[in-house]
Amino acid sequence: MAERFEIVEKALLKLLEEKKYATLRDILTTMNPMDVAGLFDGLEEKQIPVMFRLLPKEQAAETFVEMEPEAQQLLIQGFSDNELREVLDELYVDDAADLVEEMPANVVRRILTQADPEMRSSINQILRYPENSAGALMTMEYVSLRLDMTVEESILRIRRQGVDKETIYTCYVLSADRTLQGIVTVKDLLLAESDDTEIKEIMTENVISVTTQDDQEEVAKMFSKYNFLALPVVDTEKRMVGIVTFDDAMDVMEEEATEDMEIMAAMTPSEKSYLKSTPFDLYKHRIPWLMLLMVSATFTGMIISSFESALALLPALTAFIPMLMDTGGNCGSQSSVTVIRALSLDELELSDVFTVLWKEVRTAVLCGISLAAVCFLKVLLVDRLLMHNESISLSVDLVICLALGVTVVMAKMVGCTLPLLAKRLGFDPAVMASPFITTIVDALSLLVYFLFAKTILGL
């Protein structure tokens, strides 16, 4: 699919360069606005306005919403007042609010000046809500019905108002003071026994809703759980103020998943895409965690230094340090990723900490015994018999295997408890991911290793 689109993209760019605008326009009108928006990423600045003006009015607005902020800003700066007004008239309020948030102050002033008073008021209302809240994510363009309306009256209202609404599949039944009473789907209206049936007789009551202050991540999870197409947003007095649509919830899911992946990789989350980020942008997001992890690794060095005398007496112990540290880090990462994912899907609660610990301890014991047994045979057969390393006695083999088994158990416990602890303290559990846990487990595995060596070998 990607290869086919790349071929089409090259063909369209060639038409643009050859100034075959009529042919190009005919092809663009058959394409999805999302795909058209992707074409602008490969254009030079002077080509962007040329291609955009080839699009029909409605398609131009839909494409504009999906474009990168840099291209949007370039177009706005080149628009006449009439052109800007035409694009804004075709935008939904939530898309216009997103546009305002992305633009610099001088561009924002021009957008608000050209927007009609109703849209300007709605944009300002959305922007007053906290960032990443349901209020900031919602749109006010939905179909509302009254309790006393009939099926026939409701269908007429949908026909009259639906063209400007973001979704018409679910309609919201409100009282006189705009309190949410229930929902009615278009299917309910079409299948009603009579056109004179009142809405209150066929509506679904006890509607699931969110408040304007709810976190957008929690809102997105509700879409995943209940398979909504749209979710009503109410204020503290249960008055309807807007809806969050499925496409916006999907954007939040993608954004949150990307953020978690970046945090788990020891990076500060970035709002820019990879190709739009400069080397200095990447540096700023990576260096703080790298510095922290480098400094924290000092403890590992201190442990090795404190046991220099033991290593001097039996240098063969040094050869197995990387294996112990890597195995411990891998085990801790497995547990942490599993728990972090379960927390993000709301499969785990803080009250489940002892259940998680008991499950991970049993898993760790099984893994530890298996790894220690294989390690014992490997050291005996490979290091002692094949490589003829006489310094590796059965006692040394025992030290290595015991340290490995204990390290696995400790790593699993650290990996499962730290994400839960982070959540309890109000941090993102993804912070306690592989790099951070590996650093802790490295220090613990060395400590266990050398303590076993001193105790069993008498070093």
Across the structure, where does each feature detected by a protein language model lie?
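Re-entrant/interfacial helical elements at transmembrane boundaries that shape
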Residues: A319-P322, S333-S344, P419-K423, S434-P435, ...
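Non-transmembrane, extramembrane segments of multi-pass ion/lipid transporters
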Residues: S121, D248-L282, C331-L357
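Membrane-interface segments at loop-to-transmembrane junctions
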Residues: K276-H285, E349-A364, L394, L398, ...
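Alpha-helical transmembrane segments and their lipid-water interface positions
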Residues: V108, V186, F246, S333-S336, ...
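Alpha-helical transmembrane segments in multi-pass membrane proteins
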Residues: P33, W289-A297, F320, L324, ...
